From Swiss-Prot:
Pathway: Quinol/quinone metabolism; menaquinone biosynthesis; menaquinol from 1,4-dihydroxy-2-naphthoate: step 2/2; Cofactor biosynthesis; ubiquinone biosynthesis. This is Ubiquinone/menaquinone biosynthesis C-methyltransferase UbiE. Residues 1-23 are annotated as: Disordered. The keyword DNA repair does not apply. Its EC number is 2.1.1.163, 2.1.1.201. Methyltransferase required for the conversion of demethylmenaquinol (DMKH2) to menaquinol (MKH2) and the conversion of 2-polyprenyl-6-methoxy-1,4-benzoquinol (DDMQH2) to 2-polyprenyl-3-methyl-6-methoxy-1,4-benzoquinol (DMQH2). GO terms for molecular function: 2-methoxy-6-polyprenyl-1,4-benzoquinol methyltransferase activity; demethylmenaquinone methyltransferase activity. Belongs to the class I-like SAM-binding methyltransferase superfamily. MenG/UbiE family. The gene is ubiE. NCBIfam families: MenG_MenH_UbiE (TIGR01934), PRK00216.1-1 (NF001240), PRK00216.1-5 (NF001244). One of its GO terms (biological process) is aerobic respiration.
Length: 256
C-alpha cells in the first residue's frame, strides 16, 4: 500500500493494477472488473491457463486435508470449482460455505452448482474477506484461490481468516506468484501483457479487465513475502509449494 498523503486529511492510496487509487475506490473498481468477466470467467480460466488451473486447484485440495464432516470456507469462491470438490469430500455431515464479495460471481457460482446438483451442503454468502461474518473458531479449513491479490488490505484479510479457523485448522492460499526462472519470467511477462488483454477483447469484449488482472498479478506479494505475512498474522508451520516454475504458488498455514 502507498501511504503517501497529499495533505493532512488526504485518504491513503493503494494499488489497482499499476494505478494508485484511494483505498475506498479499490473495492468498487475490482467489483466492476468481476461484474464484467463473471459470465465467461470459467472459459477464460481454461483459455488463459491452458486448463492448468484445474491441476493447481486439485493440488490445493490435496494439501487441504479436508475430510468427511469438516466445515470449509472457500473465500472468493466465484464459480464454485473448489466448493464443488469440497462438497463431495465433506459429505452430508459436513458443510461448505462459498463466500464472494461480488454478487455477479456469486450468482454464477450458485447457478452453476445448482445445475450440477452439488449444492446440497453448500451455503452461499456475500462477504468481505477483510471482515468475515462468521464466528471465531468455526471452520476446519479456509481456502482462497486467485482472490487475495484483489483484496485491499491483505494483512487484515489473513487475520480475519485466522480468526474464523478452529485451532489446528488450515488456511490455503492459491495465487499467482513470482516465476523462479528468468527465462520463464520474461516469457510470462510477454504472455500476460500481450495475450491476456487480447484474449479478453476477443472472448469477452473487455481488454481492460484482463490488463488489470495481469497488472494485479505483478503487484501481489512474492512467495517469501506472503509467507512472512501469514507468520505475522499468527499462523504456524507456514509453507509454500511452487507450481509451473513459480507462476503459481500455494501457501499453507496452521492455526495454533
Amino acid at each position: 500500500m502507498n501511504d503517501q498523503r497529499k495533505g493532512d486529511h488526504a485518504e491513503p492510496t493503494t494499488h489497482f493494477g499499476y494505478q494508485d487509487v484511494p483505498e475506498s475506490q479499490k473495492a468498487k473498481k475490482v467489483a466492476e472488473v468481476f461484474h464484467s468477466v463473471a459470465a465467461k470467467y470459467d472459459l477464460m480460466n481454461d483459455v488463459l491457463s491452458g486448463g492448468m488451473h484445474r491441476l493447481w486447484k486439485r493440488f490445493t485440495i490435496e494439501l487441504s486435508g479436508v475430510r468427511s464432516g469438516n466445515r470449509v470456507l472457500d473465500i472468493a469462491g466465484g464459480t464454485g470449482d473448489l466448493a464443488a470438490k469440497f462438497s463431495r469430500l465433506v459429505g452430508p455431515t459436513g458443510q461448505v460455505v462459498l463466500a464472494d464479495i461480488n454478487d455477479s460471481m456469486l450468482k454464477v457460482g450458485r447457478d452453476r452448482l445448482l445445475d450440477r446438483g452439488v449444492a446440497g451442503n453448500i451455503e452461499f454468502v456475500q462477504a468481505d474477506a477483510e471482515k468475515l461474518p462468521f464466528p471465531d473458531n468455526h471452520f476446519d479449513c479456509v481456502t482462497i484461490a486467485f482472490g487475495l491479490r484483489n483484496v485491499t488490505h491483505k494483512d487484515a484479510a489473513i487475520r480475519s481468516m485466522l480468526r474464523v479457523l478452529k485451532p489446528g485448522g488450515r488456511l490455503l492460499i492459491l495465487e499467482f506468484s513470482k516465476p523462479t526462472n528468468k527465462l520463464m519470467s520474461k516469457a510470462y511477462d510477454a504472455y500476460s501483457f500481450a495475450f491476456m488483454p487480447l484474449a479478453g477483447k476477443l472472448i469477452t469484449n473487455d481488454a481492460e479487465s484482463y490488463r488489470y488482472l495481469a497488472e494485479s498479478i505483478r503487484m501481489h506479494p512474492d512467495q517469501e513475502t506472503l509467507k512472512s505475512m501469514m507468520v505475522e498474522a499468527g499462523f504456524d508451520r507456514v509453507t509454500y509449494h511452487n507450481m509451473t516454475s513459480g507462476i503459481v504458488a500455494v501457501h499453507r498455514g496452521i492455526k495454533p
